[in-house]
Amino acid sequence: MDFSPPHGLRGGRSPSLQDTTISSSHTQKNGGDSTPLPPINERLAFLRPSRELLEYYRKKIAEFDEEHEDLVKRLEQYKATYEEQHKLQWEMRQREEEIAELQKALSDMQVYLFQEREHVLRLYSENDRLKIRELEDRKKIQKLLALVGTSEGDITYFHKEPPSKVTIPQRTVQSGDPFDRKVQRSGRAGVKQVPLKAPGKQDRTKAAEKEDPQILLLQVEALQAQLEEQTRLSKEQIETLLEDRKVRMEEAQVQHQRDQDKMKAMTDKLNKTQKLLYESTRDFLQLKFECRANEKSWMAEKDRLLRELDRCREQLAFSIDPEQEREHEREHEREILRLSLAEKATRSSHSEEVKSLTEQLAQAHRLSEMYREQCVTLEDELGRIREEGDVGREIFKERSDKVAKRLQLMTQRYEALEKRRNMEVEGYKTDIKLLRQRLKDVEKQLFKVTLNIGPDQDLAILDAVRQGNKKTQKIQGELRNLKAKIYGLENELRIG
């Protein structure tokens, strides 16, 4: 900042080198005897500034005011821009956190959805099992009815409860030869045997041949449907996990690239700040060196001028009368005041420049410390992000291993179910064969019993029929309970 006016704008006459030397020497020699210096306003009153000088300083002050206002406006604009950038960065960070939370919630919802679908599949399998069991129970009832057989006096109820007591019609006692009654009973037994044996046997064999394969086919279809549903569910789970893995890898890659760009930008800023700090420090040291050199040159010039002033005073001591000497001293005092004011102005300007440079250096140090702290925080954040990425990779690897193990376990379970189904089919076939053999044996025994039936065996047959009715009643009660359970499960499935 140059406050010195150009040549020709200074007020009053310019002092010569000889006058300056004489006035400085006189001031130093008579410093102890003369009165103290007048105040600054009184000393400024001796100056005679011109209009050009005042106009020059007004222009300088106006330029400095405009420059100051421009710098303040720029500083405010920079502050507003930095605050807006910080606000946008903060909002972007919040949005990223919200996106991460939403993605986590979406993953949890997918897991819950798959769990609910597995639960629904289990309910479907339970429903199929109960329906197949209902068919088996019906088949058993029909077999039992076929084994027991029906007579003209017996009534079988399927929808209502059977009577608690079995009523048997009484036969009238016939007179005559007992041999004739025996033949008649055997004849009636033969009449009963012919319609009961052949059609009952054929119906039972046909029902066994028709119903058993039907139940097995239903079981096979239910197992196939369950296997298809489980396979489709497993495929969807694997596809969802792969898609989630792909999304997470893309997000990690984008975040890594963003961190790399941010690190690069911060490194460039740090290098620029270090360069600016170096240049500011170098300029400050250069200005300090120049200021000290100027001070040394001023001191040397002042010593030289003082010596010359002493020599000139000694020469003029005898040639000037006292009045002229006093007038000359007053004139030199005025010149000394002018020189001291100019010297103070230059010193104040230099001190202001040194002060501004010192403030700039301190500001540069603060900026360098701030950028260094930012770099340290960014490095810590980068390390944390890398650690989080490594942890995420490990978690994803563990999840992938768990999914692979689960898939292998499900495959083993499916194979075990297939083996079990095959073994159950073989067991059903063997059971069917055994039941057919037992039916044949029972039919043979019934045939023998009907042939050898006597008068005392009617009550035994009635007891067997009564027991069969009781068993039928018990089985019907169990069937009603099973139907109630099945209807309850179907209602729960509809409501769910």
Swiss-Prot record:
Membrane-spanning residues: none
Coiled coil: 51-113, 214-495
Ranges for region Disordered: 1-42, 170-208
Biased composition (Polar residues): 15-33
Keyword vocabulary terms for this entry: Coiled coil
One cellular component (GO) term of this entry: centrosome
InterPro entries in alphabetical order: CCDC77 (IPR037696)
Official protein name in the record: Coiled-coil domain-containing protein 77
Organism: Xenopus laevis (African clawed frog)
Lineage of the species this protein comes from: Eukaryota, Metazoa, Chordata, Craniata, Vertebrata
Gene designation: ccdc77
